[in-house]
C-alpha cells in the first residue's frame, strides 16, 4: 500500500467516523455490533477471531458469525515468542521450557486457547482453525524501518486519526 496511501486511508476512515477504542476487549465486546449494543460493524481483530467465535458460541453454529478480511496492505503479522534471555541464571530450565512450548501437545492446545497458528511444522491444525485461514501476505515493516520510523508513524497516525 505504501506509507502515504496508508495515512490517506486512515484520514478517510476518520472522516467516515472510525472509533478507536481503549483496547481490544472494549472494541470487540462493547463497540463491535456483534456485541450487545455495539454500533460498529467492523473491528480490527485477529485472523483467528472467526474460529474463536464459532468455538465459544453458545448456539450450535456450523459457520462463524463473523469473518476476516485480508485486505492488501492491511495485514500486520503479530509474532509472539519465547526465547532465552542473555545472562539468564536458569538456562537449563529455560531450555526445557522452550522445548515444552514447542511440543506438539502445546502447539495444538495453543490453537484453541491463545488462537495462534502452530509454529512447528507438522503440527495438525485444530478443527476450529479451518475457519481461521492464515493470511497469505502480511505487510510487516522491517525491524530497521520500525526502529527508524516507528515513533514518527505513531505520532503521525495519532495526528491523522485521533486529533
Go through the PLM ranges and name each one.
Residues 46, 64-95:
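Internal helical hairpin/lid segments
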Residues 80-141:
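Mature extracytoplasmic/periplasmic domains
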Residues 4, 19, 116-117, 132, ...:
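Short coil/loop linkers at secondary-structure junctions
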Residues 127-163:
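Extracellular/periplasmic bilobal clamshell ligand-binding domains
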Residues 20, 24, 76, 85-90, ...:
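Extracytoplasmic/periplasmic, Sec-exported soluble proteins
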Residues 14-18, 33-37, 55, 89, ...:
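Sec-exported extracytoplasmic/periplasmic mature domains
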Residues 5-8, 23, 27, 31, ...:
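Extracytoplasmic/secreted proteins, especially bacterial periplasmic and envelope-associated proteins
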Residues 2-74:
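Ligand-binding pocket segment of bilobal, Venus flytrap-like solute-binding proteins
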